[in-house]
């Protein structure tokens, strides 16, 4: 499970060091794709494969699903962390997420999100008041 908030730096070559506690879960390969709210999503290869297959199965008859699958496939880069736990983010991914040197990596249970540090702070501040309401939506009657 991916949990927590981390603040790695993006180096001049576009490399980002993944948090050490997640490296074993990502050792089999990982997929970096465009996420929501101009973040990047990082999935373990197996998790991404299941997601992509599910989306592809629905896409044959639904134009919106086909568009999603096309965007997902075109915007995804397969990666393997190097010996120092770094991955290289493509220029397209860095541009999409507006990444500068200061980044934030957050755990989102079954995947990671990579944010520009300022964009993450803005997002947190804008959504702080909605957290209670979102809890009810996400968890329903459990809470």
Curated annotation (Swiss-Prot):
Q: Ranges for the SpoVT-AbrB domain?
A: 5-47, 76-119
Q: Mind listing the UniProt keywords for this protein, alphabetically?
A: Cytoplasm, DNA-binding, Repeat, Transcription, Transcription regulation
Question: One GO cellular component from the entry?
Answer: nucleoid
Q: Which GO terms describe its biological process?
A: negative regulation of DNA-templated transcription initiation
The cross-references to Pfam families, in alphabetical order and at most eight, read: MraZ (PF02381)
> What cystine linkages occur within this chain?
none
Chain segments annotated as coiled-coil in the UniProt record:
none
Q: Which GO terms describe its molecular function?
A: DNA-binding transcription factor activity; transcription cis-regulatory region binding
Compartment(s) of residence: Cytoplasm, Nucleoid
Gene3D superfamilies the UniProt entry points to: Transcriptional regulator MraZ domain (3.40.1550.20)
Quaternary structure, per UniProt, is: Forms oligomers.
HAMAP family given in the database record: MraZ
Q: Which family does it belong to?
A: Belongs to the MraZ family.
Write down the NCBIfam families for this protein, in alphabetical order.
Answer: division/cell wall cluster transcriptional repressor MraZ
The protein in question is named Transcriptional regulator MraZ
Organism for this UniProt entry: Rhodococcus jostii (strain RHA1)
């Amino acid at each position: 499970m991916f949990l927590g908030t981390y603040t790695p730096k993006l180096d001049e070559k576009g490399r980002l060091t993944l948090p050490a506690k997640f490296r074993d879960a990502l050792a089999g390969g990982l997929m970096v794709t465009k996420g929501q709210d101009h973040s990047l999503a990082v999935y373990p290869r197996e998790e991404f494969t299941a997601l992509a297959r599910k989306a592809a199965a629905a896409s044959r008859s639904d134009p919106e699903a086909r568009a999603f699958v096309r965007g997902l496939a075109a915007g995804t880069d397969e990666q393997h962390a190097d010996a120092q736990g770094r991955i290289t983010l493509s220029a397209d991914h860095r541009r999409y997420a507006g990444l500068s040197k200061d980044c934030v990596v957050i755990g989102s249970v079954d995947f990671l999100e990579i944010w520009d540090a300022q964009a993450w702070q803005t997002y947190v501040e804008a959504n702080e008041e909605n957290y209670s309401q979102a809890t009810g939506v996400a968890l329903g009657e459990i809470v």
